[in-house]
């Protein structure tokens, strides 16, 4: 009986050595990235920028195409710029546009979708930036840090505007000509 117990204990202790892991191919992981040779990097504080647009009365708009009375300034800071890599940089803005006016970004209301208003962006010369297009103007890279200035302004896209909180999601990309 003792021999059986010793043999059984030996088998239990040896089983991890004898056991082989079973491997079954279950899938693959595809990892992709991109190496770029950009002339500038976006400063951390400009990567997820929030611009507070303020509060406006619906009667501040005189009809479709009319702008809010106030332009709200914002800036994007670029760092580690090198004119040895690229001589100019531009900013392209992308996002959803309303069917009523593809020259502005969609301003969505809480749970209502289109609020009857769009968001227009302008460069530092107050030229309107058309959404989802390449920049029309580029800035020379003269220093290692640059700040590009813009303004945002609401524009009526419908006779019917829905009061409430509104927001717009806009993405930007550095473009080198």
UniProtKB/Swiss-Prot annotation:
The cross-references to InterPro entries, in alphabetical order and at most eight, read:
Adhesion_dom_fimbrial, Adhesion_dom_fimbrial_sf, Adhesion_dom_sf, Bact_Fimbrial_Adh_Pro
SUPFAM superfamilies listed in its UniProt record:
Bacterial adhesins (SSF49401)
Q: An example of a Gene Ontology BP annotation on this entry?
A: cell adhesion involved in single-species biofilm formation
Please list which residues make up the signal peptide: 1-19
* Superkingdom: Bacteria
Q: Which subcellular locations apply to this protein?
A: Fimbrium
Per the UniProt record, which residue ranges are transmembrane? Answer: none
- One Pfam short name: Fimbrial
Query: Where mainly located?
Result: other
Q: Does the keyword Disulfide bond apply?
A: yes
Q: Which cysteines are joined by disulfide bonds?
A: 40-81
Q: List keywords of the entry alphabetically.
A: Disulfide bond, Fimbrium, Signal
What are the record's GO terms for cellular component? pilus
Which PANTHER family does the record associate with it?
A: FIMBRIAL SUBUNIT ELFA-RELATED (PTHR33420), FIMBRIN-LIKE PROTEIN FIMI-RELATED (PTHR33420:SF12)
Family membership noted in the UniProt record: Belongs to the fimbrial protein family.
Its name, as the record gives it, is: Fimbrin-like protein FimI
- Species whose genome carries this gene: Salmonella typhimurium (strain LT2 / SGSC1412 / ATCC 700720)
């Amino acid at each position: 009986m003792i021999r059986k117990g010793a043999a059984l204990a030996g088998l239990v202790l040896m089983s991890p050595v004898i056991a082989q892991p079973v491997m079954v191919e279950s899938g693959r992981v595809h990892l992709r990235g991109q190496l770029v040779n950009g002339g500038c990097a976006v400063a951390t504080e400009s990567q997820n920028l929030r611009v507070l647009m303020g509060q406006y009365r619906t009667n501040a708009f005189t009809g479709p195409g009319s702008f809010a009375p106030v332009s709200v300034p914002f800036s994007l800071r670029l760092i580690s710029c090198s004119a040895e890599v690229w001589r100019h940089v531009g900013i392209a803005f992308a996002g959803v546009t309303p069917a009523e006016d593809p020259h502005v970004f969609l301003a969505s209301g809480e749970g209502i979708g289109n609020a009857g208003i769009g968001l227009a962006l302008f460069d530092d010369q107050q030229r309107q930036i058309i959404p989802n297009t390449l920049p029309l103007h580029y800035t020379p890279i003269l220093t290692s840090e640059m700040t590009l200035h813009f303004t945002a302004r609401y524009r009526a896209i419908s006779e019917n505007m829905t009061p409430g909180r509104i927001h717009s999601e806009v993405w930007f990309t550095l473009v080198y000509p």
